[in-house]
Amino acid sequence: MPHDGHEPPQRIIRLIAVGAGITGLLLCAVVPLLPVKQTTATIRWPQSATRDGWVTQITAPLVSGTPRALDISIPCSAMATLPDSVGLVVSTLPSGGVDTGKSGLFVRANKNAVVVAFRDSVAAVAPRPAVAAGNCSVLHIWANTRGAGANFVGIPGAAGILTAEKKPQVGGIFTDLKVPVQPGLSAHIDIDTRFITAPTAIKKIAVGVGAAAVLIAILALSALDRRNRNGHRLINWRVSMAWLAQWRVILATPPRAGGASRIADGGVLATLLLWHIIGATSSDDGYNLTVARVSSEAGYLANYYRYFGATEAPFDWYFTVLAKLASVSTAGVWMRIPATLAGIACWLIINHWVLRRLGPGTGGLSTNRVAVLTAGAMFLAAWLPFNNGLRPEPLIALGVLFTWVLVERAIALRRLASAATAAVVAILTATLAPQGLIAIAALLTGARAITQTIRRRRTTDGLLAPLLVLAASLSLITLVVFHSQTLATVGESARIKYKVGPTIACYQDFLRYYFLTVESNADGSMTRRFPVLVLLLCMFGVLVVLLRRSRVPGLASGPTWRLIGTTATSLLLLTFTPTKWAIQFGALAGLTGTFGAIAAFAFARISLHTRRNLTVYITALLFVLAWATAGINGWFGVSNYGVPWFDIQPVIAGHPVTSIFLTLSILTGLLAGGQHFRLDYAKHTEVKDTRRNRFLATTPLVVVATTMVLCEVGSLAKGAVARYPLYTTAKANLAALRSGLAPSVCAMADDVLTEPDPNAGMLQPVPGQIFGPTGPLGGMNPIGFKPEGVNDDLKSDPVVSKPGLVNSDASPNKPNVTFSDSAGTAGGKGPVGVNGSHVALPFGLDPDRTPVMGSYGENTLAASATSAWYQLPLHWKESIADRPLVVVSAAGAIWSYKEDGNFIYGQSLKLQWGVTRPDGIIQPLAQVMPIDIGPQPAWRNLRFPLTWAPPEANVARVVAYDPNLSPDQWLAFTPPRVPVLQTLQQLLGSQTPVLMDIATAANFPCQRPFSEHLGIAELPQYRILPDHKQTAASSNLWQSSEAGGPFLFLQALLRTSTISTYLRDDWYRDWGSVEQYYRLVPADQAPEAVVKQGMITVPGWIRRGPIRALP
C-alpha cells in the first residue's frame, strides 16, 4: 500500500482496535472464573431456653430445601429422659406436616428402639434399653455432599450411611426433649447460599475494564469505518468538534408516504398508550414482579416460585430493571412502562427506518400509503395480545428489530462498528430470556455481507482488527451473565431448571403451534392465533413471489431476503428454547408488522396481473380468519372480566364467526379455481390498473388487521366501561394514575371483600318459634335432613385443563386432570357441633354455634326441610353498602343459574324472605335461588344479594328440597348469615407476609410477598389464590414441593384454613380465594432461628456439590 500522510493515524487506530479487542476478549473470557464474595449463613442449636430451662425448638425453612451440610449430636443421656412409650428425639421438620417423613430427618424413640431415618430410609437403629443403660455416649448424625448417616457411638452395629440423595430437608430443629443446654447437645446447619454472591474487587475491575475495552475497540473500529469510506479519511479526527461529529446518525431521507405515515404514527402510538391503561396483563406478570420485589432482601434474583431458589441468571438483567421500578411503585400501570416504551420504539423503528430500507425512493414500499398503514395495523395486531405485560418479549421484539437495523446499516454503509454494535444489542437481547436467542438471527443472515466488507477492507484494516472487535463484542455476554454470579452457580441453576422442568426437546417444537389451536386456553385465543398465522402467510407468500419473479419493483431485494432469512432463522432458533409457550411468539411482533407492509405491497403488485391472484390472496386471508376465530376471545386471568366471548368462539346472530369465514373462504377458493382454469382460453385476464382495482388489491390485509385490532381494543374497552364501577384492570390503572401512584390505592385488594369472622354475622332465630329436636335450622318437621347428613368426602369434581397452559407442570400432549379444594372445604370429621353433627365445618365457622343439616344418605324418599325464620339485621337497607349479602354455607349438588343464564344441575335450596306483621305473625314473601360459584360438592358460600329482598322484608329462612334418590344428589347447609365484611387491604395491610400465587401477585401491588433472606424463607400468614380452575391447573402444580416451589416448606410447617371472600358487587365471580396459615409449631415454641452471617471468597469454578433437585 502506498505511504501517505494518513498512514500513521490509520495504523495507530488499527493497533488500538486490536489491543482493545484482545483486552476485552481476554477479560470477558476470564470473568466467569474470577472469584466472588459469597455470603455464608450457619445456624447453631440450641439457641435459647424456655422458661422451664429446657432447650427450645427453632424454625428455619430453607429455600433450597436441603442444607449444604448438617451435623447433629445428641447425648444418649438426653434421650433417656423421653417417655417410655414414644418420643421425638430430634427432627428437621415437624411431625404434623404434609409427608414430612418422606422429606426430613426424624429420630424417634419407642419402647424398643431409637430409629434414625432420612426421608423414610432407616440409617441406624439402637435398642432403647441399651441407650437407657448408658451403653452409648452420643448419637452423631450428619448429612453432606458425600452422604447421610448416623452413629450411636458405643453401641456396636448401630451405625449406617445412606447416599447423598437422602440429605434431609430442613425447616428447623424440632424435639420433645426436656433437657437444659448441655455439653454434647448441638446441631450445626450450613445453609446453601451459593447464589448470594457479590463480585470481588478484581472481578469488578475486570468487568469494568473489559466493558471499557470493548467500547474502545468499537469506537476504534468506527474510526476505521470513517477512514475507509470511499477510500479516504472523511474528517480530520484531530479536531475535537469534527471528531464528535463523526458519531452522528446519518440516515437517508427518501420521500415518505405523506399523511399516511403521520396517521400511522398517531394511530399506533395512541393505541399503545390506550392499551397501556386498558390492556390485558400477561400470564407471568405476577411471577416477574414478585421475583423483582424480593430480590433486595434475598441478596440475588431468586426464582421465587420454583427450582429450589435457583438464581435467574443467565437471564437476570431484566429482573434488575423491574426491581428498580418496583422500588418506586408496584402498580401495574407503572411496572408496564418498559413494555409500552418498547412498543413505541419498535413502531418508530419500523416506520422511520425499516420500511425505508426495504423500499426506498419514489414508488417504493416506504412511500406506499397502504403498506405503511398495513404495517401499523399488523404491528398492533401482533403486539397487543402478546406484549403488554412484564414478560421479556416486548424487549426481545425491540432487540430483534434494532439488531436487524444495525446489521442493515453495517451492510448499507459498510460500517463494521454498526455490526459490532448489533452484536452487543443481540447479546443483551439473548440474555433477556431463552427465546431472546432469536436476536442473533439477524447477525447470521447478515454475516455473509459483513464478511465481504471485511474482505474488501483487508488491505487497509487487516483481518485482525475487525475480527477481534466483533469477537470482543460477542464476548460481552459473559459480563452480562456473570457480572455477579460464577460459571459454577449459573451452571448449577441451569442444571436444576433442566432437571425439574418442564423442558421439551427441540424436535417437539411443533407443540408450540399446537398450543395455538387449543381452544379453551388464552394462548390459543383468536387474538394470538391471528398474528402468527398471518406472519406465516406473509412470509411464505413473499418468499413465493420473490422466487417466482426474482424481484418486485419498489422493494429492495437484499434487505427483503435478509428479513425473510431473519424471520425463518428466528423460528428455527425458537426450537431450542426449553419451553414451548405460545406467548413467546410475541418476540416476533416487530417482524410481523414489517412483513405486513411487504406482503401488502408485493401482493398488490401481483394481484393486478390476474383476477385469480387477487382471489387467491383474499381466500388465504379468509381462511386465516376462519382458523383464528375458531378460538375464544380469551385473555389471561382478571383481564377476561367483562370481555365478550371470553370462553366461547365469537358468535354473530347465533352463527359462529369461524363458520362464516370458512364458508366465504370456500366460495372464494372455488372462484379462484374457476378463474385459474379460465386462464387457458380467456383473451384478457389482467386486472385494469384503475384506482378501484388498486384499492381492492392493496387493502385486504390492512382491513383484516385493523378489524382485529379494533376487536381487541373494543373487547377490553367494553369490559372496562360496561362493568364500571366493578373491578377491571383498567379501573385499577386509572385509580393508580389519579392517585399519583399512591401506596394507598391497592387495585384488587380494595375490591375483594373478606369475612374474617363468619360467626359475627350469623343470624339469630326469631324468638317464640317452635321447632323440632334438630333445632331451628331443621324447622318443625324435616324429612330426610339430619345433622349427620353430610358426606365425609367432599372433594370437588376434577378440573380438566387442556395442554399448553402457561406455568402448568403437566403433560404437553394430553389433557391434564387435577383436583383442588380450598382448605377446609373438602369434608372430614370435626368436633361435635351444637346440634350433634360431627361434620368438619369450613371458613372458620364455630361448631358450638353453627348447626348443620344435610340429606346425604337419604335414598328412599324425597327429603325436605324448612328452617325457622331468622331475623335480618335491623335497618339492613341503610347498611346494605357495607353488608350487602345473605350467605349460606352449603355443600353437595345445588341447583343454580350462572350469570349468563346457564343452569347447574342439583337439588333445590332457596332463601325465602318474610316480614313480621304487627300481630307477630310472619308473612312469607318471595323465594330466591342462590348464586353458586362452586365447585360441587365441596363446601362453598351461596350468595343471596340483599338487593333481591323485598323492601319490607325483615326475616328470612332456608327452604331445601331433595327429591332425587341418587347417592350423588344431596345437599347440606348451615344457618344464613349477613357477613361483616372488610376489604382485603384492611385485613392484610401492606406489611403482613403473604404468598401470592403467580396469577394473583400482579393484582395485589400493596401486599408484601414473604421474603427470603440468607437462604431462609419467611413464613407467610396468608395465601392469595386465583380462581378454582387456575389454582388446580397451574398454581398447585408449578409451586409444588417436588419442583422446589414454596410448598416445599409451607406444607411442611403450616396448616391452612379458608377465609370467605367476595368480589365487590360481582357476586357471580370466582375471583379467587384467601387462605390463612397457622404454624404447626407455634412461634413461641419454635421461634425464628438466629443465623450467623459470614463472608468467604469462592473461585468461579468451585461448585461444592449439587443442590438436591429430586422428588
Curated annotation (Swiss-Prot):
| Entry EC number(s) | 2.4.2.-
Query: Bias regions of kind Polar residues — which residues?
Result: 808-823
Q: Which domain of life is it from?
A: Bacteria
Q: Which UniProt keywords apply?
A: Cell membrane, Cell wall biogenesis/degradation, Glycosyltransferase, Membrane, Transferase, Transmembrane, Transmembrane helix
Membrane topology is:
Multi-pass membrane protein
Q: Looking at the keywords, is Lipid biosynthesis present?
A: no
Regions that span the bilayer: 12-34, 205-224, 333-355, 370-387, 394-413, 423-445, 462-484, 530-547, 554-576, 581-603, 615-637, 652-674, 695-717
Keyword check for Transferase: yes
Gene Ontology cellular-component annotations: plasma membrane
Q: Name one GO molecular function term.
A: arabinosyltransferase activity
What task does this protein carry out?
A: Arabinosyl transferase responsible for the polymerization of arabinose into the arabinan of arabinogalactan.
What family name appears in the similarity comment?
A: Belongs to the emb family.
Q: What is this protein called?
A: Probable arabinosyltransferase A
Organism from which the protein derives = Mycobacterium leprae (strain TN)
- Tell me what gene encodes this: embA
